[in-house]
Amino acid sequence: MDLVEELVNVVGKKNVITNKAKSLRFRKGYRSGKGDAVAVVFPATLMAMWRVLNVLHDNNIIIIMQAANTSLTEGSVPAPGYDRSAVVVNGMKIKDLQLINNGEQVLAFPGTTLFHLENELRPLKREPHSVIGSSNLGASVIGGINNNSGGALIRRGPAYTELSLYVWIDEHDEMHLVNHLGIDLGKTPEEIITNLQNRNFDLNQVPATEHHASMFHHEQVVRDVESDKPIRYNANPKELYEVSGSSGHVAALAVRLDTFPMDKKTQMFYIGTNNPDELEDIRRHIMTTFKELPVSGEYMHKNAYKLAKKYGKDSLIVIEKIGTGHLPQMFALKAWGERFLKHIPFFKPYFPDRLLQTLSNLFPNQMPKRLDDYYEKYDHYLQLKMAGNGIEEAREYLKSYFDKASGDYFEADANETSKAATHRYVTAGVAIRYQELKQDSIDILPLDIALASNDYKWFEHLPKEIEDKIEHKIYYGHLLDHVMHQDYILKPGVDAHELKKKCLKFWMSVTLFIQPNTMLGIYIWQHRP
């Protein structure tokens, strides 16, 4: 019996894809990256996943664990150059979640999305560790834990837990199921998985444990504005714990996580300035003197605002009008359309994206007037969101600060708050849309930059020999914890990997330390000149 037949025996024929065209969207990253796989497998239960992993291990197959495939740094798709065959194991059919201890914690499974968890917690007036950003793309809870994702919500920090159920292969090449959920589910893998799936325990009497189910020291780290280290970055040793930060080196079947009380009242302060130092002054004052940490503090540059307004309009409309619940199905429909039209010579590559872009031009401007007014006046924008007593703290401080500073601010209403936040998050797809409209005639270089907490001069100034190779620079990110997304749209003929080398060489000359990510992101402890 060959490998594919063994997999079909476990999960059924409809849950194994071997056709290259049909499997492409699971072998290709959201922003970049693509590799080969013998098959893409979709186990529908934890027991099926356990059996699939055993089949793959017995056949000496490289296992690529995948959830929603919303990773921006190629981590959930195969890469070229493997020494043996690979199989993608996609867990999105295992959608269950279990609220435990009256919703104060949750057990999430491979297909549990942040959107699903948000909806389940909303009647309890509670929230997951992350409720903005990647949740708009249908991201999975376990995918976030695997990569310590998140951190945009300043009070909660990156996704983290010390309580999980996972599979790993030891130094003797033996596979093990490890139950560190803090719940007695039996001894054998079959007992543990069956009891978990069937909820054979009291969900509201799960015993407390000394192990953490969320990032427990983030406030201390994020408030230290004099540290010469980054606040958060991939593979931070302090955030690596079994499944947390494992980046697919173990297979997570379940994680136990804290949930958080929903804020009763929030307020966004929309700040504009032509001097980025003013935003850093605000950050430092808030982090060192405010009693209440902000909910979030999202940054956008003028060029990012402009390009997202044009190339992200259709995404903004979908999210604002339809919501995020149907996004996975819409992505699947788009992928099917691309695959179908690829075989018809009349249609050019990326036709669905070109059609969506054309249709978006028929809709009126979606951005509120005050946000557009700030775009005309200022180059840098900060969306500062406060909650509870922090609202008045920010109100008093910003009024005093901008009596003397060159920029300005306003208190956003509900529509402005929603549009600003969604506009900021659709920016992540702008470079891809631009490239697709150019039919791959240009390249893009997306980077994630983790600056030192004490880096006052955080805004980038590239040397001319690099600047001349870039058509557009899209700067956006999480200002309060100094993590920046910098997407470069390159001029025709410029090679992204060669330019990346030049960028690294430049950054090495001005930084204390550089840590390249395993894929595309670059994480820097930096003092810019």
Question: What are these model-derived regions, one by one?
Answer:
Residues 139-146, 298-314, 420-425, 489, ...:
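Short, conserved secondary-structure transition motifs
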Residues 264-296, 303, 310-357, 369-401:
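A conserved active-site cap/scaffold subdomain adjacent to cofactor or substrate pockets
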Residues 1-54, 58, 71-105, 257, ...:
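N-terminal flexible segment immediately upstream of the FAD-binding catalytic core
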Residues 80-94, 99-141:
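Anion-binding (especially nucleotide phosphate/pyrophosphate-binding) glycine-rich loop
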Residues 122-277:
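FAD-binding subdomain of flavoenzyme oxidoreductases
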Residues 16-20, 42-43, 63-67, 74, ...:
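General beta-strand structural signal in soluble alpha/beta enzymes
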Residues 31-32, 36-38, 61, 73-83, ...:
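Conserved glycine-rich FAD pyrophosphate-binding loop
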